[in-house]
Regions:
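Catalytic alpha/beta core domains of metabolic enzymes, predominantly
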Residues: 106-243
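Alpha-helix-loop-beta-strand connector modules within alpha/beta enzyme cores
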Residues: 9, 56-83, 145-149, 204-212, ...
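Active-site mouth loops of central-metabolism enzymes
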Residues: 11-33, 83-91, 131-136, 157, ...
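Glycine-rich, proline-tolerant flexible connector loops at the mouths of alpha/beta enzymes
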Residues: 19, 44-66, 187-190, 247-251
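Active-site beta->alpha loop and helix N-cap motifs at the rims of alpha/beta catalytic domains
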Residues: 58-136
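Conserved, mostly hydrophobic/aromatic
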Residues: 31, 38, 49, 107, ...
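C-terminal helical cap(s) of enzyme catalytic domains, especially alpha/beta-barrels
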Residues: 117, 121-128, 250-274
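N-terminal small/glycine-rich loop or linker at the start of catalytic domains
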Residues: 1-23, 115-125
C-alpha cells in the first residue's frame, strides 16, 4: 500500500453531456479550466475525452492537442488521454494517434470485448438501450496496441469491464508487452456487459490481478461513487472521481464542477487519515518518468 493516494479526475467522458448536468465540460476551454481547477483541488491525474463542437465524442488529435497544451502550459498535472472515446467503428490506428502525436504520460487502453449502453436520457431518467459502444479488440490488436504504447513511452491504463478482461491482462503481461507496475482501472456499474459495483466484486477483481500493480475503481453513478472512494483506499487502491462517472455531489444535487467532486473525495481521504499524492509523487508511485 502506498503511503499517499493518487486522485484521478475523469472530467467529461464520451456519453452523457450537458443534458445530464449543465456544468459538465464539453468544449476545450471548459475542459482546460475544469482540469486546472481539479488539479488545484487535489487531483494528480486528469483523464480526458475530447468532444466536437456539437458535444459528441471525437478522436480528433487537434482537439486533444488544444486541451493538452492548454493544461500543460499551466500545470504539471498528469494527463491520461482516452483512446476509446465511444467513437464507434473507428480503426485502432486512428484511436491510437494521440500516442505518437501528443505523448501523454498515460492513456486508456480497453483490453477486452463487449458492448456498453450509450447515452443517458436525463429527462426520462433512463439509458437509451438502442445505443451501444462496442469494444472489440482482438488479441492481435491488443498486442499491437500495447507495443505502440511502449514504443511511444506512454503507460497504458488497462480498462477492465468484466471477468474475461482479467485473462487478457495476464496474457499481455506474459507476452512481455506491458511495463510494470501495471496501471489498472476496474470499471463498474455501466449498464451492459459491465460488472456491477459491490465490495465483493471489487475484492474479487483486486485479488485476481497480477502482482506489481496500481489500481483504481471507476464506480459509475451517484449511489456508489463516493462509497467507492472509501472502499478503494481501505483496500490499498487509488481513487478516481469526476463528472464522467457521476454528475452529482450528493443525492439529487448536481455537482457545480469537477473540482467540487475532487474536494469531496479529498475530504473523505483526509477523514480516514490518508494524504493525497502530488503529481510528482504520483509519477514516483506509478513508475513514470519525471516530467521535463
Amino acid at each position: 500500500m502506498s503511503d499517499k493516494v493518487i486522485v484521478t479526475c475523469a472530467l467529461t467522458g464520451a456519453q452523457q453531456g450537458k443534458e445530464a448536468n449543465p456544468n459538465l465540460p464539453e468544449q476545450p476551454r471548459e475542459i482546460i479550466e475544469q482540469a486546472l481547477d481539479a488539479a488545484r483541488a487535489g487531483a494528480a491525474i486528469v483523464h480526458i475525452h475530447a468532444r466536437d463542437s456539437r458535444g459528441k465524442a471525437t478522436a480528433d488529435v487537434a482537439v486533444f492537442r488544444e486541451i493538452a497544451e492548454g493544461i500543460r502550459a499551466k500545470s504539471d498535472v498528469i494527463l491520461n488521454l482516452s483512446t476509446g472515446g465511444a467513437v464507434a467503428g473507428l480503426p485502432l490506428e486512428e484511436r491510437l494517434r494521440v500516442l505518437p502525436e501528443l505523448k501523454p504520460e498515460i492513456a486508456s487502453f480497453s483490453i477486452g470485448s463487449g458492448s456498453l449502453l450509450g447515452r443517458y436520457d436525463a429527462a426520462g431518467r433512463k439509458w437509451l438501450r438502442d445505443q451501444y459502444v462496442p469494444l472489440v479488440p482482438s488479441y492481435a490488436e491488443m498486442e499491437t496496441a500495447a507495443r505502440i504504447f511502449r514504443d511511444n513511452g506512454v503507460r497504458p491504463e488497462l480498462e477492465i469491464y468484466g471477468t474475461s478482461f482479467l485473462n487478457n491482462v495476464w496474457h499481455l503481461r506474459e507476452a512481455g508487452v506491458l511495463e510494470e507496475p501495471l496501471l489498472i482501472n476496474l470499471v463498474m456499474n455501466i449498464p451492459g456487459e459491465c460488472i456491477p459495483w459491490s465490495p465483493k466484486n471489487v475484492l474479487f477483481f483486486v485479488e485476481s490481478l497480477p502482482p506489481n500493480n496500481r489500481w483504481v475503481v471507476t464506480a459509475i453513478g451517484g449511489k456508489v461513487h463516493f462509497l467507492s472512494v472509501a472502499l478503494s483506499v481501505a483496500m490499498g487502491g487509488h481513487v478516481r472521481v469526476g463528472m464522467e462517472d457521476n454528475v452529482y455531489i450528493e443525492r439529487g444535487v448536481l455537482a457545480r464542477s469537477n473540482a467540487q467532486i475532487v474536494e469531496k473525495a479529498v475530504g473523505i481521504l483526509h477523514a480516514v487519515g490518508r494524504e493525497i499524492a502530488s503529481p510528482a509523487e504520483a509519477r514516483q508511485i506509478l513508475g513514470l518518468r519525471a516530467r521535463v
